[in-house]
Amino acid sequence: MAAITFHLDVVSAEKKIFSGRVETFQVTGSEGELGIFHGHTPLLTAIKPGMVRIVKQHGHEEIIYVSGGMVEIQPGTATVLADTAIRGEELDAAKAEEAKRRAEEQIQNQHGDMDFAQAASELAKAIAQLRVIELTKKRR
């Protein structure tokens, strides 16, 4: 028996990253992890930096990094509106490691004019990118 699917779009300010039928997808919402299946209650919520794990028709998976944004669920369709969205295989591990190191350094060497919230946000994004890279490598 074929799984029930619904339409998912993952878009950023630059481009549409994914558009197609999916069995399910997971994303980190502002209140925790969300697993979305066909027939989910309509919802509009903020998403945190992390991944969108997509299970396409026939069980094929795709992982996309998002830097935050919104997810909207409507009957038969869902849209992830990301600030930035990058396919897992397109992420650069060296750049993510460097961004993580810089953010950790800024947090440890706080000065009066340093924006702690900005550094913490950059650290969360770098850690999320590294996690997506790790999961993408395991899938291959």
Swiss-Prot record:
Subcellular location: Cell inner membrane
InterPro entries: ATP_F1_dsu/esu_C_sf, ATP_synth_F1_dsu/esu, ATP_synth_F1_dsu/esu_N, ATP_synth_F1_esu_C, ATPsynth_dsu/esu_N
Keyword Lipoprotein: no
Keyword terms of this UniProt record: ATP synthesis, Cell inner membrane, Cell membrane, CF(1), Hydrogen ion transport, Ion transport, Membrane, Transport
Gene Ontology molecular function: any one: ATP binding
Membrane topology, record value: Peripheral membrane protein
A GO cellular-component term linked to this record: proton-transporting ATP synthase complex
CDD domains per record: F1-ATPase_delta (cd12152)
Cited SUPFAM superfamilies: Epsilon subunit of F1F0-ATP synthase C-terminal domain, Epsilon subunit of F1F0-ATP synthase N-terminal domain
Xref: Pfam families: ATP-synt_DE, ATP-synt_DE_N
The protein's assembly and partners: F-type ATPases have 2 components, CF(1) - the catalytic core - and CF(0) - the membrane proton channel. CF(1) has five subunits: alpha(3), beta(3), gamma(1), delta(1), epsilon(1). CF(0) has three main subunits: a, b and c.
PANTHER family, alphabetized: ATP SYNTHASE DELTA/EPSILON CHAIN, ATP SYNTHASE EPSILON CHAIN, CHLOROPLASTIC
Task of the protein: Produces ATP from ADP in the presence of a proton gradient across the membrane.
Family the entry assigns: Belongs to the ATPase epsilon chain family.
Name of the protein described by the UniProt record: ATP synthase epsilon chain
Source organism (scientific name): Vibrio alginolyticus
Protein's gene: atpC
